[in-house]
Amino acid sequence: MNNLTSTKFIFVTGGVVSSLGKGLAAASIGALLQARGFKICLRKLDPYLNIDPGTMSPIQHGEVFVTDDGAETDLDLGHYERFTGVKTTKNDNITTGKVYHNLLNKERKGDYLGQTVQIIPHVTDLINSFILHNTDALDFVICEIGGTVGDIESQPFLESIRQIGYKLSKNNTVFVHLTLVPYISATMELKTKPTQHSVKELSSVGIQPDIILYRSKIPLSQEQRDKIANLCNVSPTNIIPALDVKNIYELPISYHQYNLDTQILKHFNITSPEPNLDKWENILNISHVSTKTITIAIIGKYIKLLDAYKSLIEALEHAAIHNKTKLSIHWIDSRSLNNEITNTFDNVHAILIPGGFGDDGVEGKIIAIQYARINNIPFLGICMGMQLAIIEFARNVIHLEDANSTEFNFYCKNPVIHQLPELQQNLGGSMKLGSHPCYLKVDSKIFSIYKEQVINERRRHRYTVNLQYKDLLESHGLIFTGHSHHNNNDSLAEVIELKNHPWFIGVQFHPEFKSDPFQSHPLFMSFIQASLNYQETKRHKIS
């Protein structure tokens, strides 16, 4: 580790349009500094008024990423963990809603002693406290500011980082601004005007960017970089391309090739050995040697925005890479499935039902589960996916035709899935969240996958298996092979398997939150291997 005299702060903002890749840029900066031996952490400041994204629609917001300590956070924290291996916490993501919630609680308790509570200094002070909290042992803190410069919601956050930049001075802060340089194909031109306007907007709140990352298909010419440098008051060497890549794990190497980490350290007047990027080069080399292709069907209802399944997609990609396999995902809207599925699954090698909420599309998922069970197709059910596998089995094997979850039918006669009693409160913040130990049966497929009797996985659910049906389900071949302890040492079902099926597993937890490109999660590794085995078996039958 490098011993710096003080912690350095890197602020990443975005302009022109949203979804440019600020989170990936921040994660890449973290990975590059980490590869040089520095101790880093990453934080995200979200400008929306929700306290957290837990009750936001995945179609609007994307995935809710869950941390070990049970925080429901922005999906960018998933990128942070996958790129750096540094576990994020509830202290690494804040929203405008959380700031105001804390502010009003303090005001009601009399903490402000009769002061007129205002945006400046009271709101900005709380944001500053979040950014600066528990950073003394770190070399670098990388803070991503959500949204786009110019959004009214972002103004308190921008004012806060301006204040920190002023108080800590240029020697301890750097401002990185990500913009878009659109390419006009009709005239074959790159347009720099949006970047100029974005920097002007940022400057209007008192922040002068030190480095400009420009998102583009191709690099700017030296003349174009000089133009931006002159108009935006940024050195030409600090105008760095954020080029489109086929694989997001190319980004750290790409940014290093264009000297992003070098220029950041130069700004701070820090000398450092070159980064060790061997693991990044290795993962890219492995990803290019795929010899087979498998197709996995994912049945969900949020498929209009694939960011709703971001960690799941990445976990499958990690496992495919380490199995030297190219992954093809066949996305199926669960609401489109009915009993006439005919050729829907003819060319798939596995079926996966991810987590979700609500009864919309549930019957389509159950149809897919039945198809996987009957036809011996590898199946993985996650969270609701596991619960629906139990409902399908209860209905179609045990013939409890009205078996259901109380989430979908509160008055059903056979509630094989029901709500945890202590969670029948508010919708927001009312789930079993975060990492908990799970105890596996030794004589089970899940144990052979993990090779550990006690595992720790992250949860996000408020419904669980009704264990009054456990003996009945097991007597027909659906086996419970993992459990966790609950209030008063009660058990919660965590893993199910089908006794007479090559690979049929349901898990209540979310394994996708703990996968990374360098060490694929064992459950997804096994799932991909099962898919390859099924593909091979199917090929032999055809031949």
UniProtKB/Swiss-Prot annotation:
<feature type="binding site">
    <location>
        <begin position="384"/>
        <end position="387"/>
    </location>
    <ligand>
        <name>L-glutamine</name>
    </ligand>
</feature>
<keyword id="KW-0460">Magnesium</keyword>
<feature type="active site">
    <location>
        <position position="510"/>
    </location>
</feature>
<feature type="binding site">
    <location>
        <position position="76"/>
    </location>
    <ligand>
        <name>Mg(2+)</name>
    </ligand>
</feature>
<dbReference type="InterPro" id="IPR027417">
    <property type="entry name" value="P-loop_NTPase"/>
</dbReference>
<feature type="binding site">
    <location>
        <begin position="191"/>
        <end position="196"/>
    </location>
    <ligand>
        <name>CTP</name>
    </ligand>
</feature>
<feature type="active site">
    <location>
        <position position="512"/>
    </location>
</feature>
<dbReference type="GO" id="GO:0042802">
    <property type="term" value="F:identical protein binding"/>
</dbReference>
<keyword id="KW-0315">Glutamine amidotransferase</keyword>
<feature type="binding site">
    <location>
        <position position="76"/>
    </location>
    <ligand>
        <name>ATP</name>
    </ligand>
</feature>
<dbReference type="InterPro" id="IPR004468">
    <property type="entry name" value="CTP_synthase"/>
</dbReference>
<feature type="region of interest" description="Amidoligase domain">
    <location>
        <begin position="1"/>
        <end position="270"/>
    </location>
</feature>
<dbReference type="GO" id="GO:0019856">
    <property type="term" value="P:pyrimidine nucleobase biosynthetic process"/>
</dbReference>
<protein>
    <recommendedName>
        <fullName>CTP synthase</fullName>
        <ecNumber>6.3.4.2</ecNumber>
    </recommendedName>
</protein>
<feature type="binding site">
    <location>
        <begin position="191"/>
        <end position="196"/>
    </location>
    <ligand>
        <name>UTP</name>
    </ligand>
</feature>
<keyword id="KW-0436">Ligase</keyword>
<comment type="function">
    <text>Catalyzes the ATP-dependent amination of UTP to CTP with either L-glutamine or ammonia as the source of nitrogen. Regulates intracellular CTP levels through interactions with the four ribonucleotide triphosphates.</text>
</comment>
<dbReference type="Pfam" id="PF00117">
    <property type="entry name" value="GATase"/>
</dbReference>
<dbReference type="GO" id="GO:0003883">
    <property type="term" value="F:CTP synthase activity"/>
</dbReference>
<dbReference type="GO" id="GO:0046872">
    <property type="term" value="F:metal ion binding"/>
</dbReference>
<dbReference type="InterPro" id="IPR029062">
    <property type="entry name" value="Class_I_gatase-like"/>
</dbReference>
<comment type="subunit">
    <text>Homotetramer.</text>
</comment>
<feature type="binding site">
    <location>
        <position position="407"/>
    </location>
    <ligand>
        <name>L-glutamine</name>
    </ligand>
</feature>
<keyword id="KW-0479">Metal-binding</keyword>
<dbReference type="InterPro" id="IPR017456">
    <property type="entry name" value="CTP_synthase_N"/>
</dbReference>
<dbReference type="GO" id="GO:0004359">
    <property type="term" value="F:glutaminase activity"/>
</dbReference>
<comment type="similarity">
    <text>Belongs to the CTP synthase family.</text>
</comment>
<keyword id="KW-0547">Nucleotide-binding</keyword>
<dbReference type="InterPro" id="IPR033828">
    <property type="entry name" value="GATase1_CTP_Synthase"/>
</dbReference>
<dbReference type="GO" id="GO:0005524">
    <property type="term" value="F:ATP binding"/>
</dbReference>
<feature type="binding site">
    <location>
        <position position="356"/>
    </location>
    <ligand>
        <name>L-glutamine</name>
    </ligand>
</feature>
<feature type="binding site">
    <location>
        <begin position="151"/>
        <end position="153"/>
    </location>
    <ligand>
        <name>CTP</name>
    </ligand>
</feature>
<feature type="binding site">
    <location>
        <position position="18"/>
    </location>
    <ligand>
        <name>UTP</name>
    </ligand>
</feature>
<dbReference type="Pfam" id="PF06418">
    <property type="entry name" value="CTP_synth_N"/>
</dbReference>
<dbReference type="GO" id="GO:0044210">
    <property type="term" value="P:'de novo' CTP biosynthetic process"/>
</dbReference>
<feature type="binding site">
    <location>
        <position position="227"/>
    </location>
    <ligand>
        <name>CTP</name>
    </ligand>
</feature>
<feature type="binding site">
    <location>
        <position position="144"/>
    </location>
    <ligand>
        <name>Mg(2+)</name>
    </ligand>
</feature>
<comment type="pathway">
    <text>Pyrimidine metabolism; CTP biosynthesis via de novo pathway; CTP from UDP: step 2/2.</text>
</comment>
<feature type="binding site">
    <location>
        <position position="462"/>
    </location>
    <ligand>
        <name>L-glutamine</name>
    </ligand>
</feature>
<dbReference type="InterPro" id="IPR017926">
    <property type="entry name" value="GATASE"/>
</dbReference>
<feature type="binding site">
    <location>
        <position position="227"/>
    </location>
    <ligand>
        <name>UTP</name>
    </ligand>
</feature>
<feature type="binding site">
    <location>
        <begin position="19"/>
        <end position="24"/>
    </location>
    <ligand>
        <name>ATP</name>
    </ligand>
</feature>
